[in-house]
């Protein structure tokens, strides 16, 4: 067997495998955190017409559709649309001046139903 024939029969050495394993693909978007919801006892929903709990003291703001900030246990705000007016009347907010639980707590306790209260 000649030298040239022996070189043709030889195969190239196998490729070396990498020592480090390939990195896992990182997700493009981070996992979304669940929205922070207020506890059920501290805030009320406007659609249900419920009132704030006595422990909360009306801590929910009007921007979030919560309860009145003045007075503990106030009622929810009404569904009325905000009018484009620079003047803010006390009855337009839909808050109750009396504590929750009464049928006449809407409209500043005068018995006028303004909606959204107990």
From Swiss-Prot:
Q: Which InterPro entries match?
A: LCE
Q: Where is the composition biased (Pro residues)?
A: 11-23
Pfam family for this entry, one: LCE
Q: Where is this region: Disordered?
A: 1-23, 87-118
Q: Per the entry, what induces it?
A: By UVB.
Q: In which tissues is it expressed?
A: Skin-specific. Expression was readily detected in adult trunk skin, adult arm skin, fetal skin, penal skin, vulva, esophagus and tongue. Not expressed in the cervix, rectum, lung, colon, or placenta.
Biological process GO annotation list? keratinization
From start to end residue, where is composition biased (Gly residues)? 104-118
Q: Which UniProt keywords apply?
A: Keratinization
**Low complexity: bias regions:** 1-10, 90-103
- Please, which domain of life does this record's source organism belong to? Eukaryota
- What else is on record for this protein? Belongs to the LCE cluster present on 1q21.
Description of how the protein assembles with itself and partners = Interacts with CYSRT1.
Question: What's this chain's function?
Answer: Precursors of the cornified envelope of the stratum corneum.
Q: What family is this protein classified in?
A: Belongs to the LCE family.
Name by which UniProt lists this protein: Late cornified envelope protein 1C
The organism is Homo sapiens (Human)
